Amino acid sequence: MKNFSQRASRLIYALCQDEARRTGCSRINPEHVLLAMVKSEDGLGFEVLKLLRINILTFRLSLEQNITSSADGITVDSDEIPQSRRMNKFIDLAGIESQSLGNEYIGTEHLVLSAVREADSVTAQYFEKAGIDLAEVRTAVKKVQSKRKSSIENHTEQRILN
């Protein structure tokens, strides 16, 4: 399943490219996606971070400090920076998380779940230090999704009634 929400697609195919270029990386990694998400302050994934009371500034700094540039022969100013193996696995895990929640798309919230699920990732370590486990993140995702569904339903009802 590679059916991305609009925001997730924008993060994965555009914004993280900018972050990889900015940090001098020759491959896209999950940290680039999360950094782009935090900077854009948009999407359900960002809402999940806020609901979990993640300090956005320290999380962003943690991501930035742990991104290492690499010089492996690929020019950073190329049109499209390729995804790393970790990034491919990250997307696969996001798909698994999406399916486990009964969703038919991969959204930014699933990207957060995937990042926390990757054992040695910067995000997983940050969340562990904050005392937040994967189950808590899933609960937060469900809350944010249900709020979104109810607001969409209310908006639709309003249009029908008017």
What residue spans do the PLM features occupy?
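Histone-fold recognition with a strong bias for associated Lys/Arg-rich disordered tails
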Residues: M1-N162
